[in-house]
């Protein structure tokens, strides 16, 4: 409902003009991030058969896309020469307000939710090479390999089946985006670049919502303190 009102405001629908809406604050649930071992299990299943949906999951895992952005991707958005993905659309199912049409909901393909979400994502070399190998016609959707789209609900169902085959617990599709951000930080990404790749308006969003240090990462950071401790300094002398 909140998304519906916000969409109507952005599109300047007459029914909401001049009205003030107070949205309830909703506590954010922590998003689970795949460990490196879990990510390996998932990728092993994906590489067994590089179907369109499996390729899509890899794009989300190594590009940080939202599910609506992924569903809206066509092969025309992939630049194989420069190794980039253009994100300028999102696909979602919304409430149908036309009374003459019996369906309660309809599919909308439109602009991403914010201006910063319109972006050009540089892909890693391995993903660029993989996409080149499986590239279809420009008008085809990446998730289907045909001119027909795959809506988020069906995409999610297929994703859950992949997780089941990998023997993993229930991770949301958004977990892939958070896992991407976490791996980037672990690999030494600068936050500004990561923020722009994720389509965030500022780095604070990236830091507050998408950086999930693993216990291994925390341990590595804590071990740095040994260098400044008397024990650590004496340890260095003992081994010299």
Predicted regions and their residues:
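N-terminal DNA-binding recognition helix of tyrosine site-specific recombinases/integrases
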Residues: 1-20, 66-68
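DNA breakage-rejoining catalytic core of tyrosine-based enzymes
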Residues: 11-16, 24-45, 53, 96-124
